[in-house]
Amino acid sequence: TATFGPRYPRGKEYRQRLELLAAKLAPPEGSREAVQSREAVAQAQAELLDLSREAQLANPLLDFDKLLLVRRGNQAPKLGLPQNWQSNSSLPQSGFDDEIMVLSPVRPDGQLSTLFRPRPGQFVGDVDLHFSSQKMLFSMIGDNGRWQIFELNSDGSGLRQLTGEQPDVDSYDACYLPDGRILFTSTAYFVGVPCVYGNSHVATLYRMDAGGGNIRQLCFDQEHDWCPTVLNNGRVLYSRW
């Protein structure tokens, strides 16, 4: 409410409901241990989940008609999440039930429509929408059996693979830069994580032109770089192991 004022009219109500839930779970005064039953705790957790969903969906920043998302089957290997010493190239190349979808309107009863579905069993993820909203980047297995970066128009047309000249290199997790170029991670410099005997191929940051050319290595880390994201001031935020 302090940030959005009248655009978020129920902010105080959400805070009050949160405080009531916290009070329900608080131990009695003078006691170091909670005495609530498992049923009471489970009920409070369910109420907290409902409150969280309601409060977040009411955020004015979600005041748009469509939401781009990845739908992944719950039987996907590792849910498509590598271990914390790995990156995408350590994931299985099959066993997924993925697709890029659009939710409209953006609410629980909105309709999901498929924008892109890869070949059966393939992973698709790391979606990054262009500033214009007219196209997007994403990662999946390319035509040479390696992880590659693809671009797709927002209407589902114009699929093209941007990386993949080298037969033994994986590239993924890309984002658009304000100058039109693309930042991404790649295993092209052939480094492995030492504490797992090198079997986790390290991906670090690279940059390329919009068409996939003029690739330049930006980081020379021993361990992984993950999730590059452009901030509002043009700087790049990323995670590193």
Mark where each language-model region is.
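Structural WD40 beta-propeller signal
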Residues: 130-132, 175-177, 221, 231
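Beta-propeller domains
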Residues: 220-241
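Multi-bladed beta-propeller domains
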Residues: 108-122, 153-170, 209-223
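Short coil/turn segments that connect the beta-strands within blades of beta-propeller domains
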Residues: 64-65, 132-134, 179-181, 233-234
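Beta-rich catalytic cores
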Residues: 63, 96, 123-125, 132, ...
